[in-house]
Amino acid sequence: VIEAQQLSKRFGALAAVRAVSFTAADGRITGLLGPNGAGKSTTLRMLYTVLKPDCGDALIDGHSALRAPLAAARCLGVLPHGAGIYPNLSARENILYFGALQGLTRAAARSRAAELVRLLEMEEFAERRAKGFSQGERLKTALARALVHSPRNLVLDEPTNGLDVMAVRALRRLLGALRDVCCSRAT
């Protein structure tokens, strides 16, 4: 469960986020909607502890983003807007690197990477350098990195940006399947 509690953030005179509160329940897909500049990305950055709120807090599976930011962040898989992947690493190496950053052993990271490559249908490009990847291949690689540590919560910032209609549909199906797999494991 993700709980935003009166999150607020200012940048100088600009109030980017004003007292935002919501709950994103387990097993649900929750979206933040609003026009450009409404503070959606800023709100997400406060959730995944990249930005500290001026007021309020966020609880990620009970961990305070303010008082226990590392514990809160480890409960999240994050796909930030414009998620860059390392172009000189293969897709699999990108996943393994993030596994190491999340504290996975080499064996656990290898096993999880193999599982994600299958789940996300990345077999054709898993061993290729990411430099020439299509937008869809980059997205799958970034999504695999976000999922490598098997987080209970996934935060996506504009995941369909730059994708064609077919890729958007495929991503929606994939996210629904991921939710179904994760929710069936939890029960």
What does each model-found stretch correspond to?
Residues 96, 100, 107-125:
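Conserved ABC ATPase "signature" region
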Residues 143:
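Hydrophobic anchor residue at the start of the ABC signature
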Residues 154-158:
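Catalytic Walker B motif of ABC-type/P-loop ATPase nucleotide-binding domains
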